[in-house]
Regions:
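Short beta-strand scaffold segments in enzyme catalytic cores
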Residues: 38, 45-50
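Nucleotide/phosphate-binding catalytic cleft detector across ATP-hydrolyzing
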Residues: 1-36, 52-166
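Gly/Ser/Thr-rich loops at beta-strand to alpha-helix junctions
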Residues: 43-45, 135
């Protein structure tokens, strides 16, 4: 039963399907892990927390590109700037400073949320990244998992779950 995956204080009907699917996928792919932080970096940036196989809640933020496009549409001095993967800490001009903020700033935001969640819940979480921007946040040296196909696999798991009910 899908509701058995959700903490009693969470309203499943008010949770996006993509997030439900990612949680289901993580539990199916990594059944030996009990607690997860699933970070989906796409149009929106979402962090979803699973403790003892139960969805506890999450965070939704504008995605990196969504924020960037919104800023350049509203700030007259940066309308014609192109998005790049500049990783310098400080920019020497407006364009470089903007890229430092979006690239390093988003990475630091994610790292800070991870630290806060781990400190608050005192768990050993399996951290799973997915979404189009995820590959630029993590590198091969990190202990995090990158599953480009997490949502796609979850969709298949969810469809199988629905078929089993009938």
């Amino acid at each position: 039963k899908l509701t058995s995956l959700v903490h009693r204080r969470v309203n499943l009907t008010q949770l996006g399907n993509d997030r439900i699917i990612n949680v289901l996928s993580a539990i199916k792919i990594y059944p030996k892990s009990k607690s997860f932080i699933i970070i989906d970096l796409g149009t929106a940036t979402t962090l979803d927390i699973v403790i003892n196989y139960k969805y506890f809640g999450g965070v939704i933020l504008p995605g990196r590109t969504t924020s960037y496009e919104n800023l350049i549409s509203l700030a007259s001095g940066i309308k014609n700037m192109k998005f790049s993967n500049n990783t310098n800490i400080l920019g020497k001009n407006t364009s470089q400073a903007l890229m430092s903020g979006f690239n390093i700033g988003y990475k630091l935001m994610i790292e800070s949320y991870l630290k806060l969640i781990k400190t608050t819940y005192k768990r050993n979480f399996k951290v799973i990244f997915t979404g189009g921007y995820a590959s630029t946040i993590i590198n091969k040296k990190t202990k995090f998992i990158y599953r480009e196909d997490l949502t796609l696999l979850g969709t298949s798991f969810y469809q199988n779950f629905l078929n089993e009910k009938h």
